[in-house]
């Protein structure tokens, strides 16, 4: 069922306005960037004034997942599972060099070269670790993106380039990232 064009634009505006100013955040903090996330949520920077509510009880109550820190291949299935538990529409901010591209550990055998290999990322915040102001800037960019979204039936669908068969490379499955156990050689 399509919303008539006359009603569609005002409804889309209201839905996107509500989404953009009531983001419940689920922080997946893995390293020092998580400390900067906590600093951003404190009273000095106060991202609640932007409509961002920190510390959702879990992924099922969250709209926004902030992945901060080094993502290892062993942690990848947990990130993928938590992302899948989030209700639509869901957004992801990759916060810091480690979650963007592996950071200083990019050449390690066990480090995923960016969280975007696992889940679609909406905003990248660079830095090692990024300052709280950088996260605030990333949230503002995400809110601009939400305001420009088209809403589908029920107002929750959005095009996802990584999920579509024609757009971009598909993210790796979490199962492909689980390495077999490494056993020490047996003495002979």
Curated annotation (Swiss-Prot):
Under the heading Pfam families, the entry gives:
Oxidored_q6
Chain positions covered by the region annotation Disordered: 153-188
UniProt-annotated location(s)? Cell membrane
Say which family it is in.
Belongs to the complex I 20 kDa subunit family.
Give me the segments passing through the membrane: none
The name this protein carries in UniProt is NADH-quinone oxidoreductase subunit B 1
Q: How does it assemble?
A: NDH-1 is composed of 14 different subunits. Subunits NuoB, C, D, E, F, and G constitute the peripheral sector of the complex.
Database matches in PANTHER family: NADH DEHYDROGENASE, NADH-QUINONE OXIDOREDUCTASE SUBUNIT B 2
What Gene3D superfamilies does this protein's entry cite? Answer: 3.40.50.12280
Keywords recorded for this protein, A-Z = 4Fe-4S, Cell membrane, Iron, Iron-sulfur, Membrane, Metal-binding, NAD, Quinone, Translocase, Transport
Bound cofactor: record note:
Binds 1 [4Fe-4S] cluster.
* Gene Ontology biological process terms in this record: aerobic respiration; electron transport coupled proton transport
The free-text function statement in the UniProt record for this protein reads:
NDH-1 shuttles electrons from NADH, via FMN and iron-sulfur (Fe-S) centers, to quinones in the respiratory chain. The immediate electron acceptor for the enzyme in this species is believed to be a menaquinone. Couples the redox reaction to proton translocation (for every two electrons transferred, four hydrogen ions are translocated across the cytoplasmic membrane), and thus conserves the redox energy in a proton gradient.
As for membrane topology, the entry says: Peripheral membrane protein
Source species, domain of life: Bacteria
């Amino acid at each position: 069922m399509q919303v008539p064009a006359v009603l569609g634009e005002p409804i889309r505006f209201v839905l996107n306005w509500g989404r953009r100013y009531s983001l419940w955040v689920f922080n997946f903090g893995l390293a020092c960037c998580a400390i900067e996330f906590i600093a951003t949520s404190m009273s000095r920077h106060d991202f609640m004034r932007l409509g961002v509510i920190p510390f959702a009880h879990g992924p099922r109550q969250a709209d926004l997942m902030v992945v901060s820190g080094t993502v290892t291949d062993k942690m990848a299935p947990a990130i993928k599972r938590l992302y899948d538990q989030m209700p639509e529409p869901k957004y992801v901010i990759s916060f810091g060099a480690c979650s963007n591209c592996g950071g200083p550990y990019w050449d390690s055998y066990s480090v995923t070269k960016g969280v975007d290999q696992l889940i679609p990322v909406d905003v990248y915040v660079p830095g090692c670790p990024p300052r709280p102001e950088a996260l605030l800037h990333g949230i503002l960019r995400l809110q601009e993106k939400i305001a420009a979204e088209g809403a589908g039936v029920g107002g929750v669908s959005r095009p996802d380039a990584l999920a579509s068969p024609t757009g971009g490379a598909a993210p790796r499955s979490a199962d492909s990232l689980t390495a077999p156990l490494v056993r020490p050689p047996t003495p002979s």
